[in-house]
Structures are given as structure tokens and as C-alpha cells.
Amino acid sequence: MSDTDTKHWIATVPFADLARRRRTRVEVGDRALALFLVGDRVFAFDDVCIHKGRSLSRGVVWQGRVVCPAHQWAFDPETGRAEGRDECQPVHDVRVVDGVVHVDPRPRSQEEI
């Protein structure tokens, strides 16, 4: 089964918009997601931080990590793992097709990461 068969891709925002702002919040079904541009790659997290419940989309990318604005926990954009902690922020698969960012609204399982 191919990647396109197992994922539920939802179009969100034009890549050009994300490239200008470097981060944004999107609603995908009943989930709020935070999209970040780290280098030339797009990453998606659940927007609500696992620690204090703040919006990650208001955070920043610093040294290749997504940093929460509430408490400065730094998350690995690939895995969602909080630096120096055992907790993981839920992450989502992302692709860019024809200049539009698509995400799978279902978080990846830890086994997939």
C-alpha cells in the first residue's frame, strides 16, 4: 500500500504564505494544528502544547527546534520529543503538492517516528 493510500491528506495553506510567516495555525477537521517552516521543510504539530496548553503556533523556531511561548520547552520537529524530557508533542505527516501544504489530521504514532 502506498503512502497516498494510507494517509488522509487535507489541503491547508499555500506554501508561499507559510514561507513568509514561518509559522501558522490551521484548523483541520476538529483539530487545531501548528505548521512551521524549519529550514526548507514543513512540520505540523497539534497546536495545543502538552505541557501548559498554550498555542504552539505562537512559538518560534530556534536552532532547528520549535519553542513553546509559555515555558520555552523545545520540541524536535521530526519527532515531537521535548528536549530533555520524556514527553512528546503529537506530530502529523506533511507534504507540499502544487504549492499547497497538505497534512494528515491523524497524529503519527510513536512507532512511526
Question: Model-derived features: where do they sit?
Answer:
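Short cysteine clusters
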Residues: 49, 68-71
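N-terminal pre-ligand scaffold of iron-sulfur
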Residues: 1-63, 77, 81, 90-113
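Short helix-to-coil "ATP-lid" hinge immediately C-terminal to the conserved N-box Asn in the Bergerat
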Residues: 74
